[in-house]
A protein has these predicted regions:
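N-terminal non-catalytic structural scaffold regions of very large proteins
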Residues: 2-541, 589-708
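Short beta-alpha junctions and helix-cap segments that line functional grooves
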Residues: 97, 130, 137-139, 559-560, ...
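Flexible, glycine/threonine-enriched loop-and-boundary segments that flank and lead into catalytic domains
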Residues: 124, 542-573, 715-729
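Hydrophobic beta-strand positions
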Residues: 312, 573-574
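Edge strands and adjacent loops of beta-rich recognition modules
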Residues: 701-722
């Protein structure tokens, strides 16, 4: 026997002994659970942030883009290319074969398009190949040129209306407002120390706000005074800065500021303002933007807790809902809002700043009547008996349009048809005049001590753009480029009297190049970290505030990187990189989910009459905004078998405070103490005894561990190891 063969035999013998020892050791070891808490909620699927989002894109997102872009008409409006349907074919290779061949795991996308000649009435329908579209594997990755890539979810500021304040050198509060759409022109309001209010349109030069109000159609001084109840700040703006006297003057003045150097006319100014704000193709709120606008600009949030100075009557019936002198609860304020009432008068306390004879600044509070204007949106469920989601209505609707529909419809079928037909009017995708007037009213109300400024770092004001939405945005860019090409071809071929077909008009190159560009060069499209199963899983659950439309690491301040109370159970306070990206890249917590608007939710058990509901089917998922003000018990609070609290005082959390309250005041309870941490941090045994800096390093270094050839169970574990391995699907 040669030395080499002897070495091989010895090696095999050692392996057999080791294998036998491992088997006998594993059969002897019994897992002991030292946890004091039983009945913790089972972890959700840990890669669903990726898979669910891509599934939404395939089923709904891609169709939304087609419906937004089509129909495409030529300049004479004689030809129209309409969208009928779209589908994915089977992929040429499966994911494994794509890796072997260094190919893209993709499926052909086909769209059925209809070309209508309005002159002749001729209609041609055919299926058009729209390019190969990359598909997501079951494990939440894409295979591009044989390599697995992950699209990292992006954490961005949500579209909405945000108010802030700063103090001038005399200590006076100066307010600012920013109206942010998902896509389109920004509106920014600001005031100076002389109580003059300005507006910036699309980050251009500032304009007196009364000039802007006139340009929108409220032309004379009397109309402005009537609409905003003789507000002294608007009066000061008119006296000191506004030289215009009617709508025509204001339109020309606005156009000069927005388009300096171009000849100003009333028509061109009207067209420009209409394109900036009231064209759904240029100004897009999306569902989440409309939700945030309605939440902020509804009349209820400003009326609650204030005393009415005039009676409030239902416009439709004339019935007095509430008399003057009533201090409104939130439910009563919601009743006023859902009755379609856009304005009400309440008692307010405004600050007035004086300089005393000794030269000191003095503040006096003066009681006054303030007018509150809302945006006229109501809950449609209060007016119809059927579910409107199937009709395309999932948000609050414009009361004026709903009233028209209700008055004209004579049967339920007619009502359903009218609601479906006018869904875009009921829930506008762009900003409307009522929204703009409500934003100005809120700004003036803040000066009178009504309403609150916003915390921009609160997770209720930040949302997740996950893979489906990022792909949809890229797809829309490609389609917008393609739309121009189609329109030009329509005109050329119509002039040459060529035989037109949908295939001849469509050029797919802009769409395919936009998608390739995204997967190849976007900072959010990254090679998957494949050191070990944990590295793969955390990469798919990563949240980045960087990337297009996000922050830049050079300009991001301390506040945006810091841990915020609203991160609890949503974003891990521990796992983040060291170095320039600290706080800008983070990880989802173990139980966190993303709702259909893109806001992060975390689960809680309900607590009613001091009894915790231990049924896992009755868990409630709340976003950071919904959780505000709630008193939430800790997940390790000791309970009796019937779900009642053992102790007569319970440690709780309420926003940024940690009160100790009797059980009767507790509203919700954490589902598990692990809820606060990410997957990597949850794998650290006895995490609560670790120093935070060491835990941060540990959770990052676990991703760099070299995996064993033959995997072993950990001697000390936290109980989630099995699911981490299963969900990483390696």
């Amino acid at each position: 026997m040669t030395l080499f063969s002897l070495q091989i035999e010895i090696k095999k013998g050692v392996e057999r002994i080791l294998e036998k020892n491992v088997r006998t050791a594993e059969s002897r070891i019994k897992r002991r659970n030292y946890s004091r808490i039983s009945g913790s909620l089972k972890l959700p699927n840990l890669v669903e942030i990726q898979t669910d989002s891509f599934k939404w894109f395939q089923e709904k997102g891609i169709r939304e883009v087609f419906e937004d872009i089509y129909p495409i008409t030529n300049f004479n409006d004689t030809l129209s290319l309409e969208f009928v349907d779209c589908r994915f074919d089977e992929p040429k290779y499966d994911a494994d074969e794509s890796k072997e061949r260094d190919a893209i795991y993709a499926a052909p996308l086909r769209a059925t398009l209809r070309l209508v000649n309005k002159k002749t009435g001729e209609i041609k329908t055919s299926e058009v190949f729209m390019g190969d579209f990359p598909l997501m594997t079951d494990s939440g990755t894409f295979v591009v040129n044989g390599a697995e890539r992950v699209i990292v979810s992006q954490l961005v500021r949500s579209p909405g209306v945000y108010y802030a304040s700063e103090k001038d050198k005399t200590g006076k509060d100066l307010f600012k407002a920013t109206v942010i759409p998902n896509r389109g022109a920004w509106l920014e309001y600001e005031m100076d120390s002389n109580d003059v209010v300005y507006v910036r349109i699309d980050k251009n030069r500032k304009i007196p706000i009364t000039t802007f109000i006139r340009a929108l159609g409220t032309g004379t001084d009397e109309e402005i005074a009537e609409m905003f109840d003789n507000d002294e700040r608007l009066s000061q703006t008119i006296i000191q800065k506004d030289s215009t006297k009617n709508t025509e003057d204001a339109l020309i003045d606005v156009y000069k500021k927005l388009r300096p150097g171009e000849p100003p006319t009333v028509e061109s100014s009207l067209t420009h303002l209409n394109n900036l704000f009231f064209d759904a193709k240029r100004y897009d709120l999306c569902r989440f933007g409309r939700y945030k606008y309605n939440k902020k600009l509804g009349i209820a949030s400003r009326l609650a807790g204030h005393e009415l100075t005039r009676p409030v009557a239902d416009e439709a019936t004339g019935e007095i809902l509430f008399d003057a002198g009533v201090t409104l609860t939130f439910d009563q304020a919601m009743q006023i809002q859902d009755a379609g009432i856009k304005e009400a008068y309440i008692k307010a306390e405004t600050k007035e700043y004086f300089v005393t004879e000794s030269g000191e600044n003095e503040i006096r509070f003066i009681e006054k009547e303030a007018k509150v204007i809302g945006n006229g949106m109501v809950d449609i469920a209060k007016y119809v008996d059927f579910d409107c989601e199937a009709l395309g209505i999932s948000e609050k609707v414009r009361y004026a349009v709903l009233r028209e529909i209700l008055d004209s419809a004579s049967s339920e079928d007619e009502l359903r048809t009218a609601i479906r037909k006018r869904a875009d009017e009921l829930v506008p995708k762009h900003i409307i005049l009522d929204d703009i007037y409500a934003t100005i009213s809120f700004f003036l109300n803040l000066c009178d001590g009504i309403g609150n400024v916003d915390d921009i770092d609160h997770l209720g004001n930040r949302r997740i753009r996950s893979v489906g939405e990022l792909l949809q945005n890229q797809f829309r860019i490609g389609f917008t480029r393609m739309e121009r090409v189609i329109r030009e071809r329509m005109n050329l071929q119509a002039q040459d009297n060529d035989v037109l077909t949908p295939q001849a008009l469509v050029n797919i190159r802009p769409v395919t190049s936009a998608i390739k560009e995204f997967f190849g060069s976007s900072p959010l499209s990254q090679f998957m970290d494949q050191n070990n199963p944990l590295a793969e899983l955390t990469h798919k659950r990563r949240l980045s505030a960087l990337g297009p439309g996000g922050l830049s690491r050079d300009r991001a301040g301390m506040e945006v990187r810091d841990v915020h109370p609203s991160h609890y159970g949503r974003m891990c306070p521990i796992e983040t990189p060291e170095g320039p990206n600290i706080g800008l890249i983070s990880s989802l917590c173990v139980y966190a989910k993303i709702d259909d608007l893109g806001f992060i939710e975390t689960p809680y058990r309900k607590v009613e009459n001091s009894m915790v509901d231990m049924n896992n089917d009755d868990i409630v998922y709340l976003s950071a905004e919904e959780e505000e003000g709630k008193i939430i018990g800790q997940g390790n609070a000791p309970l009796n078998d019937d779900g009642s609290f053992i102790r007569d005082k319970v440690k709780c959390r309420q926003d940024a405070d940690y009160p100790v309250v009797p059980p009767s005041e507790v509203e919700l309870m954490d589902v598990s103490p692990q809820q606060i941490a990410s997957i990597a941090a949850s794998l650290i045994p006895f995490l609560e005894h670790d120093d935070a800096h060491r835990a941060l390093m540990g959770s990052n270094m676990m991703r760099q561990a070299v995996p064993l050839i033959r995997s072993e169970a950990p001697i000390v574990g936290t109980g989630i190891e099995k699911q981490v391995c299963e969900d990483s699907r390696t």
